[in-house]
């Protein structure tokens, strides 16, 4: 990396490119004269679209190729959706910036119905997420959940083709891509607790690039980072990836963080919940503590069953 050029590794989906362009614009605004270019790449998770995420297995489905570009020197930073970022990083890489969070909620999208409550019994709802599935079926066991993968445009097209009565997507992705009008209703975090890091964008780079860390500093949002740190600590203690029925969401209350966590049976028959509060400086310890509460309630058995069915740890 020259001191006046930064190369961004990014996935090729419309949402990933939006996030990379957002980081590019922020960097160029903060550092006039800086040249920022994009290096679009295809991840393993992007290639394997014919199976649910939980069946594919492994962590880092959407980031490993980008990390390879960093390690080989082909790129200087990688821009990720925080909910896709594994808890541990390859030697020589680290997460140095978390940008301000967009709406973290799940969105109900339908061409016929205004809300989840309005769906008739037997309606077909599309999602690729066991987390969403567990919470949906806990509220509405009369619904049919059908597998849904692909980028945002593909998922909307499948809904429009009549394959589903409704689909559930992250509100942040729809908002960022200009599809906010497709959101019929945003689902309260009380009814659908988000994935850890949902709605936040993270920037990964080489640990040795201290000059680059300084350039990234204006993009870092401390409030978001504290909240996401607690969420990721919970995920790490539960050995969770982006394809397991784990939910967690932290908010700041003055000088405290309030973290809620959930582990659910994919069929919705059991939802384990835990929560806790701690000073801002103890975000990581808070995540571990809430995770321990879930484990004491029996979360490990639920997660082991999911991992066993998927055929991976």
Swiss-Prot record:
One of the protein's GO biological processes: heme biosynthetic process
The record's free-text note on cofactor binding: Binds 1 dipyrromethane group covalently.
Enzyme class: transferase
Matches recorded under CDD domains: PBP2_EcHMBS_like
Residue list for modification S-(dipyrrolylmethanemethyl)cysteine: 242
Enzyme Commission number(s) of this protein: 2.5.1.61
InterPro entries: HemC, Porphobilin_deaminase_cofac_BS, Porphobilin_deaminase_N, Porphobilinogen_deaminase_C, Porphobilinogen_deaminase_C_sf
Pfam families per record: Porphobil_deam (PF01379), Porphobil_deamC (PF03900)
Keywords of this entry: Porphyrin biosynthesis, Transferase
GO molecular function: hydroxymethylbilane synthase activity
Pathway(s) it belongs to: Porphyrin-containing compound metabolism; protoporphyrin-IX biosynthesis; coproporphyrinogen-III from 5-aminolevulinate: step 2/4
Reaction catalysis annotation: 4 porphobilinogen + H2O = hydroxymethylbilane + 4 NH4(+)
Source organism, top-level taxon: Bacteria
Annotated GO CC locations: cytoplasm
Cofactor(s) of this protein: dipyrromethane
Job of this protein: Tetrapolymerization of the monopyrrole PBG into the hydroxymethylbilane pre-uroporphyrinogen in several discrete steps.
Subunit structure: Monomer.
Note: The porphobilinogen subunits are added to the dipyrromethane group.
Entry similarity comment: Belongs to the HMBS family.
Protein name per its UniProtKB record: Porphobilinogen deaminase
Originating organism: Pseudomonas aeruginosa (strain ATCC 15692 / DSM 22644 / CIP 104116 / JCM 14847 / LMG 12228 / 1C / PRS 101 / PAO1)
């Amino acid at each position: 990396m020259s001191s006046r050029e930064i190369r961004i590794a990014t996935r090729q989906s419309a949402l990933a490119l939006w996030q990379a362009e957002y980081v590019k614009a922020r960097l160029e605004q903060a550092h006039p004269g800086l040249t920022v270019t994009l290096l679009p790449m295809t991840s393993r998770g992007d290639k394997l679209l014919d199976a649910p995420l939980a069946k594919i297995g492994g962590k880092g489905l959407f980031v490993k190729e980008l990390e390879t570009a960093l390690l080989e020197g082909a790129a200087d930073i990688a821009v990720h959706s925080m909910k896709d970022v594994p808890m541990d990083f390859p030697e020589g890489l680290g997460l140095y910036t978390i940008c301000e969070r967009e709406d973290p909620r799940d969105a109900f999208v339908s061409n016929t119905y205004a809300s989840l409550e309005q769906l008739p019994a037997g309606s077909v709802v599309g999602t690729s997420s066991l987390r969403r599935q567990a919470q949906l079926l806990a509220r509405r066991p009369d619904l049919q959940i059908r597998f849904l993968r692909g980028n945002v445009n593909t998922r909307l097209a499948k809904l429009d083709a009549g394959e589903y009565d409704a689909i559930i997507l992250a509100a942040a992705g729809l908002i960022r891509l200009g599809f906010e009008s497709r959101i019929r209703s945003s689902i309260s975090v009380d009814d659908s607790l988000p994935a850890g890091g949902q709605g936040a964008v993270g920037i990964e780079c080489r640990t040795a690039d201290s000059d680059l860390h300084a350039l990234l500093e204006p993009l870092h949002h401390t409030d978001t980072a504290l909240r996401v740190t607690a969420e990721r600590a919970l995920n790490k203690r539960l050995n969770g990836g982006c394809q397991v029925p784990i939910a967690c969401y932290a908010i700041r209350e003055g000088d405290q963080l309030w973290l809620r966590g959930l582990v659910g049976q994919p069929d919705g028959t059991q939802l384990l919940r835990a929560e806790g509060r701690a000073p801002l400086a103890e975000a990581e310890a808070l995540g571990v503590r809430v995770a321990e509460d879930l484990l004491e309630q029996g979360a490990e058995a639920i997660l082991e069953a999911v991992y066993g069915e998927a055929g991976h740890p």
